[in-house]
Amino acid sequence: MSNIPAELKYVDSHEWLRLEADGSVTVGITAHAQELLGDIVFVELPKVGASLAKDEQAGVVESVKAASDVYCPIAGEVLAVNEELEGEPELANSDPYGDGWFFKIKPANAADLNGLMDAAAYAKEIGA
């Protein structure tokens, strides 16, 4: 079974979100997503300063098995991207909830986080 941290929020496209103390939101792909993808060999991230709509494509993950789009789970402005992933895309496999994060976003509306799945709902979604 996949590791599903209780403190995070989730969406059905297999991204996780963590609300930070400064009000920003860190986004990455779930352990379940990286297990399905297999060994990740390339990650394309959004540009810092980009304004993304909810469910807009924010990047791409390529693995030995497939390429998959990464979506922005809430609307907002990209504040930072994880540049470590450019040289070490395998961090998304080895530490999906830590060093393998994808980008940070300033939410257009913090209330958007309220409609997202908690860990229990995500576990049910993926049959864990």
From Swiss-Prot:
Organism per entry: Chromobacterium violaceum (strain ATCC 12472 / DSM 30191 / JCM 1249 / CCUG 213 / NBRC 12614 / NCIMB 9131 / NCTC 9757 / MK)
NCBIfam families assigned to the protein according to its UniProt record, in alphabetical order: gcvH, PRK01202.1
Pfam families recorded: GCV_H
Gene expressing this chain: gcvH
Function: The glycine cleavage system catalyzes the degradation of glycine. The H protein shuttles the methylamine group of glycine from the P protein to the T protein.
InterPro entries on file: 2-oxoA_DH_lipoyl-BS, Biotin_lipoyl, GCV_H, GCV_H/Fam206, GCV_H_sub, Single_hybrid_motif
Cofactor: (R)-lipoate
Chain ranges of the Lipoyl-binding domain: 24-106
Residue numbers of N6-lipoyllysine PTMs: 65
Protein name: Glycine cleavage system H protein
Entry keyword set: Lipoyl
PANTHER family: GLYCINE CLEAVAGE SYSTEM H PROTEIN (PTHR11715), GLYCINE CLEAVAGE SYSTEM H PROTEIN-RELATED (PTHR11715:SF3)
Family: Belongs to the GcvH family.
Subunit structure, as described in the record: The glycine cleavage system is composed of four proteins: P, T, L and H.
Gene Ontology cellular component terms for the protein in this record: cytosol; glycine cleavage complex
Gene Ontology BP terms: glycine decarboxylation via glycine cleavage system
Note on how the cofactor is bound: Binds 1 lipoyl cofactor covalently.
